[in-house]
C-alpha cells in the first residue's frame, strides 16, 4: 500500500509518495519515543510539545479516545515537480484510485 504526500497549503498538490511497511498502535505516546526516538520526523522536543498540545486538547488525565498511530514508511520518493490535483482535496485527505494514481505519474 502507498501513501501519497499532498500539501493543502502553499503550493497545493502531490509532492511525493512512499510505501507503507507497517502500522503500529500505541496507548502511551512515550512508548513511541522510546522505540523510534531517532527515526521520527519530529525531534524529541517537537514530539514532546505535540504530546503536550494533545493533552491540552483532550484534557490532562483524560485518556485519549483513539490510539496513537505510527506509520513506518519505506521507498520514500519526492516527485521532481508538484502535481496539481484535478479536484479539491480536503485537509483530511482522500483515497486515490489506480487510474488517478496513473494520471499523477504521467504528469511527472
Curated annotation (Swiss-Prot):
Q: Which UniProt keywords apply?
A: Plasmid
Q: Which Pfam families has this protein been placed in?
A: DUF365 (PF04033)
Record-given protein name: Uncharacterized protein MJECS03
- What is the organism of origin for this protein? Methanocaldococcus jannaschii (strain ATCC 43067 / DSM 2661 / JAL-1 / JCM 10045 / NBRC 100440)
Q: What is the lineage of its organism?
A: Archaea, Methanobacteriati, Methanobacteriota, Methanomada group, Methanococci
Amino acid at each position: 500500500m502507498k501513501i501519497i504526500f499532498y500539501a493543502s497549503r502553499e503550493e497545493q498538490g502531490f509532492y511525493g509518495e512512499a510505501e507503507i511497511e507497517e502500522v503500529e498502535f500505541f496507548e502511551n505516546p512515550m512508548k513511541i519515543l522510546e522505540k523510534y526516538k531517532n527515526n521520527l520526523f519530529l525531534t524529541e522536543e517537537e514530539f514532546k510539545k505535540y504530546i503536550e498540545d494533545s493533552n491540552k486538547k483532550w484534557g490532562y488525565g483524560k485518556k485519549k479516545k483513539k490510539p496513537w498511530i505510527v506509520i513506518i514508511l519505506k521507498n520514500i520518493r519526492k516527485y521532481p515537480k508538484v502535481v496539481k490535483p484535478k479536484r479539491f482535496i480536503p485537509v483530511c485527505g482522500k483515497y486515490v484510485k489506480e487510474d488517478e494514481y496513473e494520471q499523477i505519474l504521467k504528469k511527472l
